[in-house]
């Protein structure tokens, strides 16, 4: 990685990093210049361990940390473990997500035909998960008296909605608004907060969509860059926002979505 994207020795914590976008973000941050190491979180610890092992084998520094981000006590334990192993968290990437619905729109039930347990889980991971993680790292981040970075991965569904994704869309929109307020509050402490908005990306969760040629033909007509995103596309932006290069950027929402916004 170029030295212009220097991490300033900051320790990073990436949630939902056992595969897909989160895993690639963790790898990017670990391999960046002057990285302080990465805590790889996932609900499924074996996934986090596999990513951490890959980072360590490549010469980086990483640990695996299990947590359910919707549970405040679980998150606080995760942050404590990270601090003990690597040091105070200087970069938080909120990537953990739960769509709470089938990947194919036609297979999704109307939200009123689902149950409160599904609603609570979807809101818990996508909205309260961000609140829990930000709340757990901020006290230590402020005590560092050094630049800090908070980044949340948000979906285009938060801005434009999606068929059968009402609860998910609302939760992600709430998280985006929360981040903007965090940016206002934390600017005086040299801590920035930004959102990255993503659309259809090649991950294990989207394979049913990506493997349907007819569906993909219609979908790609809505993108200026006519291909699905790759995890590295999002990780590149996350690395920039986590690095010293972004110190005067805060409270912003960046679409990394192949021009989906303009094609609507």
Predicted regions and their residues:
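Short C-terminal tail/terminal secondary-structure segment
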Residues: 2-4, 160, 239, 250-264
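Residue(s) in the substrate-gating loop at a strand-loop-helix junction
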Residues: 155
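Canonical Rossmann dinucleotide-binding motif of NAD(H)/NADP(H)-dependent dehydrogenases/reductases
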Residues: 3-39, 182
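Short, small/polar-rich loop/turn modules that mediate ligand/substrate recognition or access, typified
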Residues: 187, 192, 249-251
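Alpha-helical segment proximal to the catalytic Tyr-Lys
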Residues: 139, 184-185, 247
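Substrate-binding pocket helix/loop in short-chain dehydrogenase/reductase
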Residues: 103-120, 219
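Active-site helix of classical SDR
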Residues: 134, 171, 179
